[in-house]
A protein has these predicted regions:
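STAS-typified acidic loop motif
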Residues: 4-29
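Acyl-donor-binding surface of acyltransferase catalytic domains
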Residues: 22-105
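Conserved beta-strand in the GNAT
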Residues: 1-6, 74
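Short amphipathic alpha-helical segments, especially helix-boundary/capping motifs
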Residues: 9-11, 32-35, 84-86, 114-120
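Short amphipathic alpha-helix that is part of the acyltransferase structural core
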Residues: 15-23, 89-136
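Active-site rim helix/loop that mediates acceptor-substrate recognition in acyltransferases
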Residues: 55-57, 129-151
Length: 151
């Protein structure tokens, strides 16, 4: 089990958030203990990530008060082995990539994101938060990444 105090979510969501990543050796009782600890520390929003191959954890989440919200896939493509099918490659013609470095361009893009580009992530579909908070979260994530020199 790995617990992360998601301090960045205070700005994004307005709550003190924690993320708990479980592994195959964890149990519902261990999760309950960790949950009590972080609630005592001020947790207002808790995200629990479970491995897909652990039915004991997956099927206990609802009885612990959690709601299944999203599945995350991790995809890797070995570029040297990948050949794009012609049916997909045809959509790539005529596209261009433009780096936006001006502050006004970035603010315009952040505004587009805040208005609801993302509709199906766990924050946007949560009735407590909604699409506005979800958009704000992604815009802040992008802004922070660019400020740290990411691309």
């Amino acid at each position: 089990m790995k617990t992360t105090h998601a301090v960045w979510e205070r700005e994004n969501l307005g709550v003190d958030a924690y993320e708990i990543a479980l592994d195959a050796s964890d149990t519902p009782d261990l999760l309950r203990q960790e949950e009590r600890r972080i609630v005592a520390a001020g947790a207002e929003y808790i995200v629990v990530k479970t491995p897909v191959d652990c039915p004991a954890l997956l099927f206990s989440m609802q009885s612990l008060g959690y709601t299944y919200v999203e599945t995350v896939f991790h995809v890797m493509i070995r570029r040297d082995e990948y050949h794009m099918p012609a049916s997909i490659a045809r959509f790539d013609r005529g596209l261009s990539v433009v780096e936006r470095t001006e502050a006004a361009d970035r603010e315009r893009i952040y505004g587009l994101i805040r208005r609801g580009v993302f509709k199906s992530d766990r924050v946007s579909i949560d009735p407590f938060f909604g699409r506005e908070k979800g958009g704000n979260r992604y815009a802040n994530w992008l802004r922070g990444m660019l400020e740290r020199g990411g691309s």
